[in-house]
Amino acid sequence: MGARLKTGLWVRAVLRRISSDGTSAMVLKKGDEDAGAVLIVLTDRSGGTGVLREDGSGWTRVDASDAASVDAYLERQKQYDPDLWIVELEMRDVSQPIERTLGSRRLDLDEEA
């Protein structure tokens, strides 16, 4: 696995960037400052919800489309990984892609090409 930005630094940068676009963003659970995994909870005003998890080079949407399944997923992940970060973004529409805006913590993406 290649070099990555420290999680705390990456989360703060994403919060600043997302907030500057008018999207509400907050940390629901602070994990390990250096190497914690990150889950992104997506919500919108119409009640839509979703979860993004990091994969090797970006983000994957988790199969959790209602509040109860999102909460259950988050609880399982917190038990499995105490270093986990959980960030919530309130968007206009959770079905719209935000994965590219989030980017990746990896510093070596060009090496795979």
Indicate residue ranges for each PLM-predicted region.
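Polybasic/polar functional segments that serve as interface/processing modules
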Residues: M1-A113
